[in-house]
Amino acid sequence: MEIKAEEISEIIRKQIKEYGTEVAVAETGTIISIGDGIARIHGLDKAMAGELLEFPGGITGMVLNLEEDNVGAAILGEFSEIKEGDSVKLTGKIVEVPVGPALIGRVVDAIGNPIDGLGPINTDTFGKVEVKAPGIVKRKSVHQPMQTGLKAIDSMVPIGRGQRELIIGDRQTGKTAVAIDTIINQKGGDVVCIYVAIGQKRSTVAQVVSKLKEHGAMDYTIVVAATASEPAPLQFIAPYTGVTMGEFFRDSGKHALIIYDDLSKQAVAYRQLSLLLRRPPGREAYPGDVFYLHSRLLERACKVSDDCGAGSLTALPVIETQAGDVSAYIPTNVISITDGQIYLESDLFYSGVRPAINVGLSVSRVGGSAQVKAMKQVAGTLRLALAQYREMAAFAQFGSDLDKATQMQLARGARLVEILKQPQYRPIPNEKQVLIIFAANNGFVDEYPIGSLGRYETELYAFFDSRKATLLGELRDKKAIDDAMKGEIIASLEEFKKEFTA
């Protein structure tokens, strides 16, 4: 083999030309104590609050406390392999998570890593977990409806796109059911849904995902799961991860819906973190900034002005109360941050009224301006009628001889309560909700026994689908009832009345 000196010298010359000295400088510190997902690190003098840290084994952390001689950090992942004396690097970055359409249909953990076994997520877009909420100029008042498909909510506690509506109630009152039905109702629409599970059992999350798949809802849904077995830092950061993913769609001019299930568990995780970081405890041992924890999260859900893309992010946070105590610390905080609440009551739930919405305590502060006009026309008196019925029913327990008018009002009220009941996973389109409430308000169901009203409703929908499809379509498109349409609806209901036998 012949060695050519020119060739070798040419290669050496080329390599010298391309040679560049790049020295990577990273500030490192040493772990002085670790446990319960919290590490104290000495030597990170240039660390910034909220900065991302790199621990051995590719695990990341987040700076939470800046103290005189050390830094307190939350470890975002499994910390059993990390030990005292290990070195930690500053990254100079803030915690980021993957965002974009590639996440739709996937189940990810609290920092955006896929956990559904469907391979990696192909996206180059990342979003910062902690960003400032849009300012006043960038916002617009809520004016478009966000249909839940639940008669009791769409008629009396309407939700608009960009609203924050709290779902509050004791355990096992159907809070998650309301949220899941709302997701299922977005099928065929233009809303991307994000379901954030915080501190729930893995079996529960798996059940939710399988229900969403069964109803074809995973085609437009992202699930972020920080289950009960995850360390507290991951349960604390999961809602911020979810809202970052939602903001991508909001800022792209699209519409998104995010459900935090539930923020009570996030507050508990944050309390645990704060106490371990030795921050001074306040009321109920929560840290002083627990209000800010939720306010900065929920302020990121809004309706964006037309100049900024006209997108929206609607938030449905869930709060679990203890024995119906709405005046506890976290419930009062979140009630004051949100634009209204849907209050679910265990007494109603056990008496068979499902969804178990207490109409008297539930309110939507901004949704009224977003409600479909047809629904506003038929449901305007509904809340008052139900309130009067509840009051009369309470008095009627004491007296037996009631006058005719009172008896009629009680009968009508009982039928309204029955009409507003709805089975789970069966959201109803808005035009059909309008029909059944119109029928109940105008006395079309008064003569039937309460037990047959479920069948009346099912058969009424089938009748309109098969024989009055044009009228139904007109109601769907116009979204309002004029005199001519009112006459048509009454005539159709009279026609159905002749055919229906209780």
Curated annotation (Swiss-Prot):
Role according to the record: Produces ATP from ADP in the presence of a proton gradient across the membrane. The alpha chain is a regulatory subunit.
Q: Which GO terms describe its molecular function?
A: ADP binding; ATP binding; proton-transporting ATP synthase activity, rotational mechanism
Q: Which Gene3D superfamilies match?
A: 2.40.30.20, ATP synthase alpha/beta chain, C-terminal domain, P-loop containing nucleotide triphosphate hydrolases
Q: Which domain of life is it from?
A: Bacteria
Which organism is the protein's source?
A: Geobacter sp. (strain M21)
Q: Which UniProt keywords apply?
A: ATP synthesis, ATP-binding, Cell inner membrane, Cell membrane, CF(1), Hydrogen ion transport, Ion transport, Membrane, Nucleotide-binding, Translocase, Transport
* Pfam families hit by this protein: ATP-synt_ab, ATP-synt_ab_C, ATP-synt_ab_N
* ATP-binding as UniProt keyword: yes
One GO cellular component term, please give it. plasma membrane
Protein family (similarity comment): Belongs to the ATPase alpha/beta chains family.
As recorded in UniProt, its EC number(s) are 7.1.2.2
Report what the protein is called. Answer: ATP synthase subunit alpha
Query: Keyword Hydrolase on this protein?
Result: no
Reaction catalysis annotation = ATP + H2O + 4 H(+)(in) = ADP + phosphate + 5 H(+)(out)
Q: Could you say which residues bind ATP here? A: G169, D170, R171, Q172, T173, G174, K175, T176
Membrane topology value: Peripheral membrane protein
Q: How does it assemble?
A: F-type ATPases have 2 components, CF(1) - the catalytic core - and CF(0) - the membrane proton channel. CF(1) has five subunits: alpha(3), beta(3), gamma(1), delta(1), epsilon(1). CF(0) has three main subunits: a(1), b(2) and c(9-12). The alpha and beta chains form an alternating ring which encloses part of the gamma chain. CF(1) is attached to CF(0) by a central stalk formed by the gamma and epsilon chains, while a peripheral stalk is formed by the delta and b chains.
For the site Required for activity, which positions are given? S362
| Localization of this protein | Cell inner membrane
